[in-house]
Structure formats: structure tokens, C-alpha cells
């Protein structure tokens, strides 16, 4: 059946791509185009709309996007009681976060029921560049060098983006969009203090300063430092982040962008607790050796140019992005020697394990967009690109026996990934400009090599996949927009899997979506959608042979609803609500038909904000129903708390923001936020280096902040 679907969709895409006459195409609605025409200074500005599937993440981009999509804007980030990006993402239907610290430093993201430790099954980008340690071989976010002061908005695309943004995009794409460099120099100083109770305070200082030094050269510096303790014992935290960006307009049609970033993190990890210890005091820590540290230096250089017309090719535009990252991270944990006691938190550690990994990543992605001719009123907009990524990974694990100081090297591995991807899509708009059909194809080629320095063993793994996609958008009238899409997505075999595998295929999924957006006026927005993710060839470990194989299958299906409304007679009040239903089931193995671990069937989001003069009051909440922590869907928690039902929880947050004064380009504001307002106690399980026990979720915290812009 999957083979038939693949060929049918491929043939349909090929027919739609080549059969129609070549035409020019505009991706924006007339209203959006008129708005943009008032603000751009340079001809190249529109490259962000026509050359990129996601555009600029403006309201019209979202309204006319042929897939499920939501944008969290700057005001929501600033006034929504968000300690970190984690807090903001909790309010998006379909996203669940296992927050262990409240700092956002080690995000644990689940998108539409797809989850792996340290967000391994979520594609997160910053300005279109992957944030993963290694986009193919190590997709986790163990290092997350992004602060709230850097980001203007978050663009969450849950469908329809697989052709242009891959790999690891089965559940969708989260793009963190940086603040634009202002035309006039501006500086913002901010400081927040979060009180976690029992004398524990977490400080966060931030600086953002930038502007155009000349008519053609802009510079932006963003820096922040987070230090202190989060709300639990054994939680010392020290995070430093510095990012410098530059824009150089060579002329009105040529733009050069550069970015350099340095990120440092050192954290103690409180870890999970045994059930008895959790009941006694969820704030305590019984894992005194657990900690984490990491370093990364990231850089990017991009060039954008509007060439104009080349014969039959009209409005030709080039975007060429190059990026590199050199990273290291190390998790240090206490362990027991017996396999039946490895991760027990209620017993003193016998081993001190270190797991340093080094990553060197280089990537380059040129992308062209153009329109072609005009015949019969049909319009086309083409986008084609190629991306090459090289990854080199050093993987070490060592154990220090505490009783006698004996050190044992457990793993000494080296990996190389050489990836090449190519994609093409064609957005075809019919004469009345109401129906747009976008077929596309993506080709992924990955060569992975593994070398065991200790034994001399070498292993190779190759994957070759063609990934079709097709999206359809229909503007029924000024109020209603309908969409549907189908696409093939993949996640490459991870470096630790190819060691014990035998020429593994990539994990593949068919994604289907259909939905609608309704916007009768500027005060009301409704989005409703349904989806199906048919995930096959998931890589699983055969416990008998200890070999990884493409055995696993899961099916994720559900619906998502988002509402936003402001009363006609009280426009200062904005109310929002959301609901997500998820039916994620295992489709293979001994537990076929049971729920996928960690997935909640129901998610509810409620919130609102009210602005009166210079004061804004915001209230938000999220609810997740119960979940299971193992494939067998075990209800009763066992003695070591490695399995058992996870509780439902409803968490409320609030923030009051007030502008103290604003004049002559200066603004001074203050805020007070309470997270987990009613101090709801709940826990997670299976979090990375402390998988047994109850991982306590953040309790109530109070955050006071000051911000000065001049």
C-alpha cells in the first residue's frame, strides 16, 4: 500500500509540475502586497516572501499557508509570563513539553506525539538554520543557544513544509525568527529575577543593542546571562550567550548577512526521585553527581541577490546560506553497577559516568526562485535548492568506580555523516487567484561511517530517499481559507543506531492534513485542522539479538482547534483558546494497538490579556491528560518508578506588565509574573540521564523584571 501511495503521489506531482504552462506567480494576497509596498526600502526585501516557503511569518503568510501553522509574536513572548521559549510553546496545540528545570536550557519537546529524549524528533530552526547538534546524525537539542531577547517571533509549522525544510520534519518545523536590525540604533537592557522558594533565585540579565551604522551597514549584538538556582536543590546554573549579527547592503539588490555566536552552559541536574522521596519533598535532589556542561560556537554567512529577468525566467532570486557549528557537551551522572539498579535515585552512586561528545558541522544551501511567463492567467512560482552537510562526531563514554578510582573506557567512537539534499517545488495559482497547488520533491542522500577506535571495527550505512509533497490551498472568499497537504518525511538513522544495525533505512512517515481558517474580521480568528501521520520503518532495538532494525510502526492522528477573539465593544481584551486531540497508537510488535508512550489524548489551552493604558494583564493555562511511560501502557507504578501512569495536570500562569514611562525614544517598563499559579504538583518520567523515578515539574515561581530601551 505504501508503495502505491508513493508512486501515485509522485506521478501526480510530476504531472502538475510540468503539464501547466509557465507563468508568473505572486505568493502574497493583494492586501499584503499593498501593505508591504509602503514599508520596503529595497527591491530585495520581497525575497523573503517569494523565495521561502514560510515567507516572513506575517498574518497574511499564516492565513494563506496551505497547512497547520501558528505564530507567537513579540508581544505574546514579552507579556505572556514566559520564563523561556519552553513556556511560550506550551500554549500551542499539538506541542507538549517535559520541563525539568524551568530554564529552557534542555528542552524536551514533543510535537503531535513524536518524541525522543532532548527533542530528538522535532526540527527546530533559527532563521531557517538547524539548531540540532548534528542535523542528520544527532538531532537532539542538548545545546539550545537561544534566549528570549534574541527572538522576535516563533513560527510553528505542523504540516506542508517537508519538501523545503528537512530532514527530521515528520511532526513539523519550529522556526525561531530573530529580531530585525532596526534602522536607527537602539539598546535594550533587561533583568529578571525568578524566585523558586526556599531561598533559591535565578537571575537573567540581557542586552540587545543594534542599528544601522551607515545607510548600508547594520550591526546587532544580543547577549544574556542566566545564573543562580532554579527551584530545586542541586540546581546551580550558569549560562552565557553572545551573538553578533551584521547586514551589508552591497546595493538595493544584493545583501550579505553574517552571524557569529558563542554559548556556554554549566548546570547541576536535580534528577528524578524515588516515589517515597518525591512524596517527602519534590524539591530535594538525591543525585549529587549529576551535571551538564556544553560549549558551542556557531557562525553563518548568507548572500541574497535579485537578478531580475533571465530570458523566460522572470524575477530570478538567489539565497545562499552557509553555516557551521563546533560544539561539545558532557553529561555527568551517578550510576549503580548492577543492571537492576543502574538508575536508582534512592541508592548512593557507585559509578561516575562521563559522556563527552564533540560535533563539527558545516553546511551550505543555495536556493533559487523564479517565475516563468504568463499564459491563460495561470501563475507559477518555482523554488529549487541544494543543501550539503558534513558532520564529524566524537563519542566517548567512561566510568569511574568511586570505591577505588578505577576508570574504564566504555565507548570511543567516531562518526562521519556526508549528506546531500535537493528539492524543487512549484506553486501554481489558477487564474482567479483563489486556488494554489504546490507540488514538490525532495531527494535525500546520506552516507554515514562509524569507526570504533578501541576495536578497529568500521561500519557504513547509506540511505537514499525521494520524498514527494503536495499542498493545496483554496481561498473560498475573504473570510474562509481551506487547505490540504500530503507529504513524505524522514529521519535519518542516528549515529548510535548504525553501530548495532545492518544498513538501516531512514525512518519514514506519510503525513496528511486538511483544515480551514476563518477570519470574519480583524477581531476573530479560527483555525481547525485534522492530521494523520503514518510512521513506518521506525528504528527499534531487538532485545534478543541486540541489533537495531527497521521494525517499528506508529500512527498519530488527531485534530487541533485554535480560537482568538476580541469583543467589539472591548477591543483591549483578547481571549484565546485551543484544543488538541491525539490518538497515537503502536502499529507493530507485542503492544500493537496500545498508546505511544508519553502521549496525552487531550490538550486544552485557555488564556487572555487585557490592556488598560500602559498596563497589560495576561492569564494563560494549559492542560494535558494522563499518559503512559512505557509501551505496555502500565498503570501501576513499579518500585523503581521506571514505568507507571503519568498524571494529568492543568497549569495556570499570569503576568502584569506596566510601562513606567515612554518618551523621546526611551521606554522603561516593569513586569511581575507567576508561573504555576496554583502550585500544581506533577511529574514526568524517562528524562534522559535520570530515566527511573519521578522527574518533578517546576512548582510555583515568581518572576520580577525591569526593561529599559533607549
Model region roles, listed by residue range:
Residues 161, 178-210, 223, 230-232, ...:
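Short strand-turn segments of transmembrane beta-barrel domains in outer membranes
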Residues 369-373, 431, 437, 530-534, ...:
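Gram-negative outer-membrane beta-barrel transporters
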Residues 61, 86-133:
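Extracytoplasmic beta-strand/coil segments of soluble accessory domains associated
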Amino acid at each position: 500500500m505504501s508503495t502505491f501511495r508513493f508512486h501515485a503521489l509522485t506521478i501526480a506531482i510530476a504531472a502538475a509540475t510540468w503539464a501547466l504552462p509557465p507563468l508568473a506567480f505572486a505568493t502574497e494576497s493583494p492586501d499584503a502586497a499593498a501593505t508591504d509596498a509602503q514599508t520596503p526600502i529595497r527591491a530585495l526585501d520581497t525575497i523573503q516572501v517569494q523565495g521561502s516557503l514560510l515567507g516572513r511569518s506575517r498574518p497574511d503568510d499564516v492565513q494563506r499557508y496551505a497547512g497547520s501553522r501558528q505564530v507567537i509574536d513579540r508581544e505574546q513572548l514579552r507579556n505572556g509570563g514566559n520564563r523561556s521559549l519552553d513556556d511560550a510553546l506550551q500554549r500551542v496545540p499539538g506541542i507538549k513539553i517535559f520541563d525539568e528545570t524551568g530554564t529552557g536550557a534542555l528542552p524536551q519537546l514533543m510535537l503531535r506525539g513524536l518524541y525522543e529524549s532532548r527533542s530528538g524528533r522535532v526540527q527546530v530552526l533559527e532563521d531557517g538554520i538547524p539548531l540540532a547538534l548534528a542535523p542528520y546524525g544527532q538531532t537532539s537539542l542538548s545545546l539550545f543557544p537561544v534566549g528570549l531577547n534574541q527572538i522576535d517571533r516563533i513560527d510553528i509549522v505542523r504540516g506542508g513544509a517537508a519538501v523545503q525544510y528537512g530532514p527530521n520534519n515528520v511532526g513539523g518545523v519550529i522556526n525561531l525568527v530573530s529580531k530585525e536590525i532596526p534602522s536607527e540604533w537602539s539598546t535594550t537592557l533587561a533583568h529578571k529575577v525568578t524566585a523558586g522558594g526556599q531561598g533559591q533565585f535565578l537571575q537573567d540579565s540581557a542586552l540587545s543593542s543594534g542599528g544601522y551604522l551607515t545607510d548600508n551597514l547594520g550591526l546587532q549584538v544580543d547577549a544574556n546571562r542566566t545564573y543562580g538556582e532554579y527551584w530545586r536543590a542541586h540546581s546551580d546554573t550558569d549560562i552565557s550567550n553572545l551573538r553578533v549579527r551584521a547586514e551589508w547592503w552591497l546595493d538595493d539588490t544584493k545583501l550579505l548577512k553574517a552571524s557569529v555566536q558563542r554559548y556556554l552552559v554549566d548546570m547541576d541536574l536535580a534528577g528524578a526521585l524515588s516515589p517515597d522521596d518525591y512524596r517527602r519533598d519534590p524539591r530535594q535532589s538525591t543525585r549529587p553527581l549529576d551535571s551538564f556542561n556544553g560549549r558551542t560556537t556557531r557562525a553563518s554567512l548568507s548572500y541574497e541577490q535579485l537578478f531580475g529577468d533571465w530570458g523566460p525566467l522572470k524575477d530570478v532570486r538567489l539565497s545562499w546560506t552557509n553555516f557551521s557549528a563546533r560544539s561539545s557537551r558532557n553529561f555527568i551522572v551517578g550510576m549503580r553497577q548492577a543492571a537492576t539498579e543502574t538508575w536508582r535515585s534512592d541508592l548512593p552512586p557507585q559509578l561516575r559516568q562521563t559522556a563527552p561528545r564533540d560535533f563539527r558541522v558545516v553546511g551550505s544551501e543555495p536556493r533559487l526562485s523564479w517565475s516563468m511567463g504568463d499564459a491563460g492567467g495561470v501563475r507559477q512560482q518555482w523554488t529549487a535548492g541544494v543543501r550539503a552537510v558534513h558532520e564529524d562526531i566524537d563519542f566517548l563514554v567512561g566510568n569511574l568506580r568511586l570505591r577505588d578510582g578505577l576508570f574504564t573506557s566504555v565507548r570511543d567512537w567516531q562518526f562521519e555523516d556526508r549528506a546531500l539534499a535537493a528539492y524543487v517545488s512549484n506553486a501554481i495559482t489558477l487564474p482567479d487567484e483563489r486556488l494554489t497547488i504546490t507540488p514538490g520533491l525532495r531527494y535525500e542522500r546520506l552516507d554515514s561511517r562509524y569507526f570504533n577506535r578501541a576495536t578497529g571495527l568500521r561500519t557504513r550505512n547509506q540511505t537514499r530517499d525521494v520524498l514527494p509533497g503536495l499542498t493545496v490551498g483554496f481561498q473560498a472568499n475573504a473570510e474562509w481559507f481551506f487547505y490540504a497537504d500530503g507529504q513524505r518525511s524522514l529521519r535519518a538513522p542516528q549515529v548510535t543506531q548504525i553501530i548495532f544495525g545492518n544498513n538501516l533505512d531512514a525512518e519514514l512517515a506519510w503525513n496528511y492534513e486538511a483544515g480551514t481558517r476563518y477570519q470574519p474580521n480583524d477581531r476573530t480568528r479560527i483555525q481547525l485542522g485534522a492530521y494523520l501521520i503514518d510512521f513506518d520503518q521506525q528504528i527499534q532495538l531487538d532485545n534478543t539479538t541486540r541489533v537495531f532494525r527497521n521494525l517499528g510502526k506508529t500512527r498519530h492522528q488527531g485534530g487541533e482547534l485554535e480560537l482568538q477573539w476580541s469583543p467589539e465593544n472591548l477591543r483591549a481584551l483578547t481571549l484565546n483558546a485551543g484544543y488538541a486531540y491525539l490518538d497515537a497508537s503502536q502499529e507493530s510488535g507485542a503492544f500493537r494497538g496500545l498508546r505511544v508512550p508519553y502521549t496525552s489524548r487531550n490538550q486544552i489551552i485557555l488564556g487572555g490579556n487585557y490592556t488598560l493604558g500602559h498596563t497589560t494583564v495576561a492569564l494563560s493555562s494549559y492542560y494535558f491528560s494522563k499518559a503512559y511511560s512505557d509501551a505496555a501502557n502500565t498503570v501501576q507504578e513499579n518500585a523503581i518508578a521506571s514505568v507507571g501512569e503519568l498524571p494529568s495536570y492543568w497549569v495556570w500562569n499570569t503576568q502584569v506588565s506596566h510601562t513606567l514611562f515612554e518618551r523621546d525614544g526611551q521606554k522603561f517598563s516593569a513586569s511581575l509574573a507567576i508561573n504555576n499559579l496554583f502550585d500544581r504538583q506533577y511529574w514526568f518520567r524517562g528524562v534522559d540521564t535520570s530515566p527511573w523515578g519521578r522527574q518533578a515539574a517546576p512548582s510555583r515561581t515568581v518572576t520580577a523584571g525591569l526593561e529599559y530601551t533607549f
